[in-house]
Amino acid sequence: MASKEATVYVVDLHESMGREMARGHDSKEVTDLNWGLQYIYSEISNKILSGRKTDVVGLVGVHTDTTQNMFEEESGFEHIDIITPIQQFNLDTLLEAKKQLVPNSDNKGDLISGIVVAVQMIKLYTKALKYIRNIVVLTNGQGNMNLGDSGGIIKQLNENRIILKVMGVDFDDEEVDYFEEDKPEHKRENELKLKEFVDRCEDSVFATYKEARDSLDIPKVKAVNPVRAFQGNLVLSDPEQQPPQRVMSIGVEVFPCTRRATAMTASSYAMSKIEPATISTPSQNNLQAVKWDRQYYVNDESGIGGKKELDRDTLENGYRYGSEIVYITKEEEEAIMFPTSASLQVIGFVNKKSVPPYMLMGHTDYIIGQRGNNRDAVAISAFARALFETDNFGLARYVNKDGKDPQIVVLMPYIRAELEGLVFCQLPFAEDERKFILPSLTSLETRSGNKTVTTHSRLLPTKEMLDAMDDYVDAMDLSKLKGEDDEPWLTMEECFNPSIHHIRNVVKECAVSQDYGKIPEPLPILTRFSQPAEELTEEAKPQLELLKHLFDIKEQFREAKKRKTEVTVGQTGLDLDALLEGELEVKLESSQTLSSNVKSEPGRQTASQSSQNSQQLSLDPENICPDFIRTLNKIDTKATSDEEFRSGATNLYKQTITLLEEKLESSKGNDAYNEIIGVLQTMREQADEMEIPDVFTAAKGQFVSKLERGDLGGQKNVLVAQINSI
């Protein structure tokens, strides 16, 4: 269970807090108050997003125009307002408080008295209950500070275990060598007094606001209290078949180690019917939550609309068996379920090199000895060290609760100064692994399968190419980079999920600013690893240039994919393709004469062009996908009308299908299946992009029909099923 926490923010609203200065990455003019409130708004927004009822907040303003606090009748507590009493904040509460957080013209009031009010608020709210108590002070140090009774205040802070955090706007910082220019003398004195006051408080913090503001650019990872997932015995051998002296049993507990974190998800809402003139922004005031209502029907001619509504409780479970449904009662279903009981049983050991890394991508869990039992702690530590010293992993059968499906897990040693135990990760079953037949990168097989080719000038890399690629990989090795203080350039602690934190920051910013038209940019730390390290790319330039030369890499410009309007192209007597290739070729005048002779017969002209396109199309059987895309783009570029483009594309799709049929007939077994599926997927993507899905559907239908008839080497039901899924 999360700890209860109470935080009171004391905000200095002195007139000087309205001073504007250029701040931030964009050097935008902003007041001291608005600059400082960014941290407070962010912290309160995090508490609102967490939704914890036990994480409460209060707000106190100092140097205000009015006086509203529990000590308002006493001297020295004037011009201090409790803007918001301690409570669970929501967006409405925050927006209401935001209206009152503005600099005031009345400079009367005392910051230290504001801290006393905050202490009393926390004492009255938390009483003697177990709470984390915080007071956060935001000031620029130019207001009044009466430290005459500082000893009594410090005693109250320490006795109530209140953590005092003071953030000073433009306070001097010797560690980063920052000193404010032209600082007023009274501000310098206030800084020294305030620092001495904070240093005498236990577990308190005195910092420049810049430190606090910079911390906002570092995403905060949600702290999660561990919840036990399993408690039982780690058993080696079968206690039901072996005598007790041949069975090892260690009392253990299982806790989560890694779990996939997910980003915030949007929910469905409906706009309420409010007059347009009264709607300014789509806030929660004019949004209504959508409720789901599911109804169940069966076809019934005697019912209303030919359907009969059913109650959810009357439905039964069934399993599909072909086109039929096999009905199994609840009693029968319980009988056929695999009976299991909670257990963690070792079934063997393997060398850690025999476990592929890609099998360890799931969530992981810690295994520790039962807390409070030294024997179990020592036993699990010895077991972990034995695995570590022999370079082995353990395999175990794991059932976390009675009746749950069993899992096969791999047990890995986890040895740290603070803990010695095990970490386990679930392994896939045979049905979970997707096995694909992928072509080799270093050799080729002939169509007959009788010969293996290891050298090919165009399809296989040469030794020089492989060596150049090795050099490039070595040049881009991240382990050579060092960050500050010789720390690694890339650490897991700095790898944040951009989607999680960016969505969270956008929601917070839009909620607080109420400006839904301005989306903040992602934090720099979230985009830090979106590009290779600049230092490495500079060092690896020679290796990259060599690769470009050896692989003959050229920049490809994206061509237009579709035409919005039909363009009329005049006869120029020149071949555009020849011009682009540097070859000047004049078209035959006879083609112009033929064009003029058949103007009265458009059908003949279209057929002639289609026939001409048919003769020009040619695809490399060993390089179908790139050639297909290149040819389709050329047809798109040369076509002067949608009809001409569709005709050429249809012809290309037919020829490609014919090529796939030939490849299938000449292959052995299912050797060509993956390549055929890949080509068809490319054809589908290009058809969708060119807005001719019907052309692809027709070509695919022709191919499937031949497969179903067995015209291409017998029945190939597996391939048909894969094609139909495209």
From Swiss-Prot:
**Catalyzes what?**
ATP + H2O = ADP + phosphate + H(+)
* Nucleotide-binding listed as a keyword: yes
Is Nucleus set as a keyword in this record?
A: yes
Q: Gene3D superfamilies, from UniProt?
A: 1.10.1600.10, 2.40.290.10, von Willebrand factor, type A domain
GO CC, sorted alphabetically, is: chromosome, telomeric region; Ku70:Ku80 complex
- A GO MF label: damaged DNA binding
Q: Which UniProt keywords apply?
A: ATP-binding, Chromosome, DNA damage, DNA recombination, DNA repair, DNA-binding, Helicase, Hydrolase, Nucleotide-binding, Nucleus, Telomere
* Subcellular location as annotated: Nucleus; Chromosome, Telomere
Listed Low complexity bias regions: 605-618
Top-level taxonomic group = Eukaryota
Q: Which InterPro entries match?
A: Ku70/Ku80_beta-barrel_dom, Ku80, SPOC-like_C_dom_sf, vWFA_dom_sf
Return the annotated region ranges for Disordered: 591-620
Q: Which Pfam families match?
A: Ku
Q: Please classify the protein's predominant subcellular localization into one broad category.
A: nucleus
Domain named Ku is located at 248-475
Q: Relate the protein's function as given in its record.
A: Single-stranded DNA-dependent ATP-dependent helicase. Involved in non-homologous end joining (NHEJ) DNA double strand break repair. DNA-binding is sequence-independent but has a high affinity to nicks in double-stranded DNA and to the ends of duplex DNA. Binds to naturally occurring chromosomal ends, and therefore provides chromosomal end protection. Required also for telomere recombination to repair telomeric ends in the absence of telomerase. KU70, of the KU70/KU80 heterodimer, binds to the stem loop of TLC1, the RNA component of telomerase. Involved in telomere maintenance.
Quaternary context: Heterodimer of Ku70 and Ku80.
By sequence similarity, the record places it as follows: Belongs to the ku80 family.
Name of the protein this chain belongs to = ATP-dependent DNA helicase II subunit 2
Q: What is the source species? A: Yarrowia lipolytica (strain CLIB 122 / E 150) (Yeast)
In the UniProt record, the gene name given for this protein reads: KU80
